[in-house]
């Protein structure tokens, strides 16, 4: 299956955000730095939720290295990243775990909802731009208390990594992403 141009744009943005040191490659240290930043974004979240999210970042990085690091250099190029991340059979389990853990992190009360402040804090910690974050949250259809369902966000994260998807809420994250 050929990925949509929107899916390719989404994955290229994720690569740039995860490349924490800006050296053009993803390495275990990049995932550790990202994990630390995101876990710190919602201090009210419980330790078990924080640990789950940190573990999902480790699995995400470990999956990439296991699947792609053919030469054993401990790092992933943009081309290698695109080839596996847009392949649900090879990367789907890591995306599922990450989606569930990140969405749960935004629900420190455990009521099944993510309020805008927690959503924005987590997405800023990942490195997305605030206007894109706000547009995404609005696209998820917040309720009268300005909250979205945890399941809605988790499903949106899964869709973000689906190669056949276009015109999804997650596409708001790539609009003028480099501006």
Label every model-predicted segment:
Residues 159-179:
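Acidic/histidine-enriched, glycine/proline-rich intrinsically disordered or flexible terminal extensions
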Residues 2-41:
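The feature marks the first
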Residues 8-23, 51-72, 97-111, 132-150, ...:
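Primarily EF-hand calcium-binding motifs
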């Amino acid at each position: 299956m050929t990925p949509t141009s929107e899916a390719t744009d989404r994955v290229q943005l994720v690569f740039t955000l995860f490349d924490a040191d800006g050296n053009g490659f993803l390495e275990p240290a990049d995932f550790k730095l990202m994990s630390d930043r995101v876990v710190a974004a919602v201090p009210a979240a419980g330790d078990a939720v924080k640990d789950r999210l940190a573990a999902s970042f480790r699995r995400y990085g470990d999956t990439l290295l296991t699947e792609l690091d053919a030469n054993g250099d401990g790092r992933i190029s943009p081309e290698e990243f695109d080839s596996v991340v847009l392949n649900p059979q090879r990367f789907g389990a890591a995306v599922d775990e990450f989606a569930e853990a990140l969405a749960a992190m935004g629900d420190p009360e455990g009521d099944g909802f993510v309020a805008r402040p927690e959503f924005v804090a987590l997405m800023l910690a990942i490195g997305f731009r605030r206007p894109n974050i706000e547009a995404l949250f609005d696209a998820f259809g917040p309720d009268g208390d300005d909250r979205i369902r945890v399941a809605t966000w988790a499903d949106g994260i899964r869709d973000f990594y689906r190669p056949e998807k276009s015109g999804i809420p997650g596409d708001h994250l790539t609009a003028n992403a480099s501006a």
